[in-house]
Amino acid sequence: MKIDILTLFPEMFAPLEHSIVGKAKEKGLLDIHYHNFRDYAEKARHVDDEPYGGGQGMLLRAQPIFDTIEQIEAKKPRIILLDPAGKPFTQAYAEELALEEELIFICGHYEGYDERIKTLVTDEISLGDFVLTGGELAAMTMVDATVRLIPQVLGKESSHQDDSFSSGLLEYPQYTRPYDYRGMTVPDVLMSGHHERIRLWRLEESLKKTYLRRPDLLEHYNFSEEERKLLDKIKEALDQGED
């Protein structure tokens, strides 16, 4: 995969080189470049200007963004504009991006963008219902979430398949050694070696956690008959005041 990031602060992306992104580069699975679009600004390196019609703040000018993208060697890139008004970023969207060969991220600053910049983009994406100073942190988050899904990047191909959201449910609780830590013990079922009982326990715990913390995820979840019965059991236990 090839990723190009347009930003006024390329140095902010240094931590990515020490994460899963750096490992993907070492394996030859990722080629990533950072472009300071101030270098392409014609007007005394000014990348922003006052909005027509008045108003507070400054807007990113179209020219530096257009010229930066036009010099990037890409055939059919997915061009993503980081915008608080965009569609929410999700695990499903990260999985979709992981199938692409070329991605371009545009990180904004100031009050917003000249609307004409949006004629370049294929996607307008938001990290959530809040506003950041710039798009860099959002871009780093999206790149990390996407790159780890590229085949062969993680040590085991199944490593991400049980992650929260990958299955549509939140992930079940997990434990490691020691068995007893300060009086807190590992659930006996996980020590049993009984694979089917462990599978059912994990599924029930995932359903319970999702029901309690993110019930919105269940609204469009495609339940199996087994999952539906387990959820009914969970609801009944909660109604009776059981853990």
Curated annotation (Swiss-Prot):
Annotated Gene Ontology cellular component terms: cytosol
EC primary class: transferase
Residues that coordinate or bind S-adenosyl-L-methionine: 108, 127-132
Signal peptide range: none
Annotated GO biological process: tRNA N1-guanine methylation
Top-rank lineage group of the source organism: Bacteria
Location in the cell: Cytoplasm
Keyword annotations from UniProtKB, A to Z: Cytoplasm, Methyltransferase, S-adenosyl-L-methionine, Transferase, tRNA processing
Keyword check for Cell membrane: no
GO molecular function: tRNA (guanine(37)-N1)-methyltransferase activity
Enzyme nomenclature, EC number: 2.1.1.228
SUPFAM superfamilies: alpha/beta knot
Complex and partners: Homodimer.
UniProt family annotation: Belongs to the RNA methyltransferase TrmD family.
Role this protein plays: Specifically methylates guanosine-37 in various tRNAs.
Designated name of the protein: tRNA (guanine-N(1)-)-methyltransferase
Record organism: Streptococcus pyogenes serotype M1
